[in-house]
Design a protein with these regions (language model features):
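Conserved ABC ATPase "signature" region
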Residues: 103, 107-130
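ABC transporter nucleotide-binding domain
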Residues: 177-267
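Catalytic Walker B motif of ABC-type/P-loop ATPase nucleotide-binding domains
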Residues: 159-162
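Conserved ABC transporter NBD signature motif
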Residues: 63-71, 78-79
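Conserved catalytic motifs of ABC-family nucleotide-binding domains
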Residues: 155
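Conserved ABC ATPase signature
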Residues: 134-138
Length: 317
């Protein structure tokens, strides 16, 4: 990846808290300009710590981070001015109006007043009609929209969203997905952490998986699905079986509890999938089937498998 394509570069990043807890372990990560990167990981995996270090909220124990070439330690103000952060918590002054909140946020970054930009921003977030209302009067979903408006008030190039749709209803979640895609189309680089696998599957260009402070992988979503996703051939039988036919007993075939379905798991990228051999073996055994279809592993299954393998490796280390 060339320097012009990389907007955030993380090298050897580590964080050990005073308690001795190691939140991050030598993380290396390059974030591409204009992409949506989703960071997946269970609670306590290190997602929020990673974001907090990049945004200058938490000091790293080791390693280096640059934002558009600016070191987050030596050039803190320049690096931070390029970043907008939407935290998990609803952190707003409840007695301020929506307009006062976003105006103050813009001023804190030393940006001159720009009423036209802020009006456009609030309209895009369906907040313009609420601009004179106090924060305490807004619903939880609207308060979260205000957090996004605050983060974008100083016109950053990069937006971090830490669990952006936690606690919001499905309709609002999909509205926010659409808004995030619009921001990406305008050139904003977006990094989000999420517990919702569907959210990452819906929006991300690339996906990173983090577990126990280690970045397990970062890959294009389509490539990840293709490389790690298993395919299954699902064979609906004409007559139930009591056991697997001898000819397929050594293959990756399972018989469902009701005996009515055979499930064959295979690597779709392999030179030989074995599907043809399986079907011929069943025909020789006189097994008749009424339907055959296939399915691809979901991102959720891939994620669960990666985290499970990581935990097993740590347990045996």
């Amino acid at each position: 990846m060339s320097a012009s394509e990389t907007v955030i570069a993380v090298s050897g990043l580590g964080k050990v808290y005073q308690s001795g807890f190691q939140a991050l372990k030598s993380v290396d990560l390059q974030i591409r300009r204009g992409e949506i990167l989703a960071l997946l990981g269970p609670n306590g995996a290190g997602k929020t710590t990673l974001i907090s270090i990049i945004c200058g909220i938490v000091n790293p124990s080791s390693g280096k981070v640059t934002v558009d070439g600016y070191d987050i330690t030596r050039d803190y103000r320049r690096a931070r001015s390029l970043i907008g952060l939407v935290p998990q918590e609803l952190t707003n002054n409840l007695f301020d109006t929506v307009w006062a909140t976003v105006t103050l946020s813009r001023g804190l970054f030393g940006k001159p007043p720009n009423r036209a930009y802020l009006e456009s921003l609030l309209r895009d977030l369906s907040l313009w009609d609420k601009r004179n209302e106090k924060m305490m009067a807004l619903s939880g979903g609207m308060k979260r929209r205000v957090l996004i408006a605050k983060a974008l008030a100083h016109e950053p190039q990069i937006l971090f969203l830490d669990e952006p749709t936690a606690g919001v209803d499905v309709e609002l979640r999909r509205d926010m997905w659409a808004m995030v895609r619009t921001l990406r189309d305008k050139g904003v680089t977006i990094i989000l952490t999420t517990h919702y696998i569907e959210e990452a599957e819906e929006m991300a260009d690339r996906i990173g998986v983090i577990n126990r402070g280690e970045l397990l992988l970062v890959e294009d979503k389509a490539v990840l699905m293709r490389q790690l996703g298993k395919r299954q051939l699902i064979i609906q039988l004409q007559q139930p079986l009591t056991s697997l036919p001898a000819a397929v007993a050594g293959k990756a075939v399972e018989l469902t509890d009701d005996g009515c379905t055979l499930v064959y798991t295979f690597d779709a990228q392999g030179e030989q999938t074995g599907v043809g051999d399986l079907l011929r073996s069943l025909a020789r055994e006189g097994v008749e089937f009424k339907d055959v279809n296939s399915s691809q592993s979901s991102l959720e299954e891939i994620f669960v498998g990666l985290v499970h393998d990581s935990n097993q490796q740590r347990g045996t280390a």
